[in-house]
C-alpha cells in the first residue's frame, strides 16, 4: 500500500516475475504458500462466501470483515509490527479488511504471453528492439508461423532439410511423418520457436549496449551514403535512419532504468485487489460485477484448458496446443486492452467489456478522475464574468455558491449568536434565507480568502487567492486584469473556487497567493496584469469617429433647412448644428467638447500647421469638390482634408477632418514621444 507520507512519487514500468510473486505470496503456519489464483470462481452460490483459490479468495486477498476469518471466528487484530496471525483451519490472516484494497494475487500462465501495450501500441517497443516488422511479430505471437531456434554445435533435424527431395512448402507435411506425437513435441520444443516464447528468447538474447552500438554504426553508414537518383530509395533510407534513432533511444532508456526487455513477455499475470473490481448487489438482490472479473475468468478458463494437455496428456496434437496458446494470448490481450486488435469483446447485452486500459486511461480513468482530478469538499464551480468595479484582489461570489461553501461557518455563527439552538434549526434558517444569515455570511467572508483555479493549471498563477464579496446572479465576477494569469477569457470559461480551511493554507493564501501580489510573470519577470484588452477597446472607442463620409453633412446652399440652422459665432471657431465646425487649434476643439457643444465622435475641421504636414501625396490627389469665394480664394475639398489656396495658387492653410477622440489620441502620443526624447 502506498503511504502518502513516505512516498513522494509514482512510476509505472515493467516488473519482474519475482516482484509479482513478492506482492502476492504469503506463507501460512503450516508451510503452505498462497497467492496464486487457480480457479475462475468468485462466490459460492449457496453460502455467498468467496471460493477458495478463486478471484475473491480470503486466504489470498484477506478477510472481507476485519478480524473475522472464513470460518466465522473473530480474532483480535494484532499490531502490524507483530507476526501475522492466521486461522489454523481456513488459513485466513487476522488483519483489517482494508487489506483487500491493495493485496494482490497472480495467475501462473501455462505459456509466455506478450504484453499487448508493448507489441501493438505505436511505436511497438518489441518490434524496435527485435528489428523485425510488426506483422511478422504478430504472426509469431499468435502462432500463425514459427522459425528455427539457433542451436549452435548441435545436430538438428532442420539442418538436414537439404537431404530431402521435398519442396519447402511440403516440408511442414513431411516432418511429422518421421515422428510419433510424443517425439514431435520434443522436436518442437527443441528446434522450433513460436508464440510469445520466441519473442522472449529474442529479447533476452542480445545486450542492450550491443544494440545501441550496432544501430549507431548503421546510422553513420547510412549518413555517409550518397543520395540515390531514385526518390523511393532516399525515402527508404530516411525511414531507416529514423527507426535506428528510436531504437537507440529505447535501448538507452532501458539501460538507465535498469529494465530487462524480456519483461515485456509475461509469465505471471498480476490480479488486482478485489476492492478495485468489486461485486455489489443492486435492488432486488441481483449481483453486479466489474468487467475485469469476467475478463480474469476468461483468462483462467483458457489457461487451465492449456495446463491439462501439457501436464497430463502426452498424445495431444501440436496444432491443438498452439491453438490453445493463441486463445490464452487473446484472453490476456482483452484483459489488458479490449479492442486493440480489432473487434472488441462484448457481453450478452452487446456492451463492450471495460478492460484494464479503459479503467485507467481517459478523462474518466483512474488517474485523471480519481487521483489527479478529485472533487474536494468546500469547492464550487461557475462561469466567470467581468467585474470592472472590483478591486484587483477581490472577486464576486454568487450567493448560492457562497452559502454552500461557508455553510459550516454560518451555522457556527448562528449558534454563537443564539439565533439557533442546534445544527438542524440553523440549517432550516439557511434554507429559508433569513436576513440574519446574509449578515453572518458577510462577516465570515470578510476574514476568509478563497482560491480560484482555472484548468488546466499550467503554472502557479493558475491558482490565485481573492477576497470574496457577495454578488447577485450565478456567475463569478472577476477583475479583467487578472485574466492573463489564468489564461482565461470571458466567453463562457469556468473556474473552480476553493475554501482554504487550515491556518497554514489561509496564511499561504494571504501572504503569497493574493492576486495583487502576483503582478509579474514567474517565467520571464514581465508584468502579467496589464490592461491589454482594455487598452484596445478604449482606443477603438476613442477613434471610431463618424464613418458616414464627408458627403453626408456637407453644406448645400440649395437646401432650405440650412437657413434654419442656429449659428454660433466665436473668435476661435465657427460652429453650426448641422454643418461640421471649424477649429483653429486642438485646444479649442477640446474646450468645445468639455462645454458639450460637440460630441466625442462628431466630425470637425481642424486647422493644421503647414510645417506639420503629414498628409501624403497632397498635391497629386484629385479633389472631390472645389469651392470658390468672391475674392478669388478657393477650397479644394478632399475626403479627409481641405486645402485653402490663394489667387496665385499658393497654399494658405490646411484643414483636416477629424474628431475629438482622434485629437485626444494624437496628443497622448505626442506627449509620450516628447517625454521619451527628453529621457534619452
Swiss-Prot record:
The keyword Nucleotidyltransferase applies. Its cofactor is Mg(2+); Zn(2+). It catalyses: RNA(n) + a ribonucleoside 5'-triphosphate = RNA(n+1) + diphosphate. Mg(2+) binds at residues 489, 491, 493. Its main location: plastid. It is an enzyme of class 2 (transferase). Zn(2+) binds at residues 69, 71, 87, 90. Its EC number is 2.7.7.6. GO terms for biological process: DNA-templated transcription. SMART domains: RPOLA_N (SM00663). Belongs to the RNA polymerase beta' chain family. RpoC1 subfamily. DNA-dependent RNA polymerase catalyzes the transcription of DNA into RNA using the four ribonucleoside triphosphates as substrates. This is DNA-directed RNA polymerase subunit beta'.
